[in-house]
UniProtKB/Swiss-Prot annotation:
UniProt organism field: Methanothrix soehngenii (Methanosaeta concilii)
Protein name: Uncharacterized protein in acs 3'region
GO BP, one annotated term: acetyl-CoA biosynthetic process
GO molecular function: acetate-CoA ligase activity
């Protein structure tokens, strides 16, 4: 889970960003994601979100962002409407100091 908002900020260099984007793009390719595929992002505002967006763009796929407050039903309808090939999420995150799970909504 991402750390609570009272934690120090995380900084990365452009070189680190490029490395992370390339690793993520290669991971997507290994899942069979190709140019034109839609990839659903069901994540809070964490550093991995822009990394995922850049990796998706790098391979020519299309990212679709879904608000992390949606329930499993709301998420499912958006996945179907977008015809997403892959859904990327996190275990959970903190909102207003309370942990909120996300992965169970995808499962």
């Amino acid at each position: 889970m991402p750390e609570p908002t009272d934690q120090p900020t995380q900084k990365i260099t452009y070189a680190q960003l490029e490395k992370e984007v390339n690793k993520f793009a290669n991971g997507l390719k290994s899942l069979g994601v190709v140019k034109g595929d839609r990839v659903m992002l069901y994540m809070p505002m964490i550093p991995q979100l822009p990394i995922a967006m850049l990796a998706i763009a790098k391979i020519g796929a299309i990212h679709c962002i879904v608000f992390s407050g949606f329930s499993s039903g709301g998420l499912n309808s958006r996945i179907m409407d977008a015809e997403a090939k892959v859904v990327i999420t996190v275990d959970g995150f903190y909102r207003r100091g309370k942990p909120l799970p996300l992965k169970p909504n995808v499962d």
